[in-house]
């Protein structure tokens, strides 16, 4: 039993590091292209694809090491563990990028989001623009953005873990 727990922990850390590493590589690519502050659905879909791939690979690797068996509980532990490790790595890099590599990142993101809001709603009044700016700045602060990234990451990681766990699970015969 302890051998199974050791394999579970090792799988979580290995695939969590892979998830975090690929996420950091993607973030570096965006930084080099000066797109790191723009967000967008393509970046979100790419991040989700990286998450799904890392979680699924971890679950399949554990199943292989566990004599071909994986129950839903183990799949959920692996998925959420991989998600937590990967998000921590990505957030640490994100802080490094925002503090060291691009200290103006929050201002760039705020201006970009505000210009997008004005483009989509040209009838915005000055008061509406000021309120929008306040909300964007509040949401872009390091503490709030970290909390949202971690929270949403766990929610999506849980959903992905459940779905992929149901797909790849294989119960032991009774």
Model-based region annotation:
Residues 133-155:
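Individual transmembrane alpha-helix segments
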